[in-house]
């Protein structure tokens, strides 16, 4: 069903992809057999693999880092839910690095062509850091537009 919406993005210049990384231990409501983070990765794979979206700038927010931190501090082990996480340290920095690498690996393996991609770890409750990140993203999008218009 998700592939049905892809044609509506043909005139889009950028996609902001929100990936709630704190949901590594949760299941989809509509299908309890599916891990929410794995579902997010499958959706990412569909987006980067789409030829219709091949030239679009991708901006990924690995979001809800504050909730991730709380879960990890409470003793919830990532490798219990994501076997591929292995014996990495069960702390926010390790999880974020692992997931950034995972998103990049999917992009390299499945992208229809090379494209500009930005990855940021965010916590929307940290408004100062979020504002800074959004300003960086805005500046990047403006730079891309200027480059395509051959002003840069």
Residue ranges: model-predicted function:
Residues 9-10:
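A short, aliphatic-rich alpha-helical micro-motif
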Residues 14, 18-152:
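Conserved GTP-binding G-domain of TRAFAC-class P-loop NTPases and closely related GTPase folds
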Residues 1-5, 24-27:
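Switch II (G3) loop of P-loop NTPases
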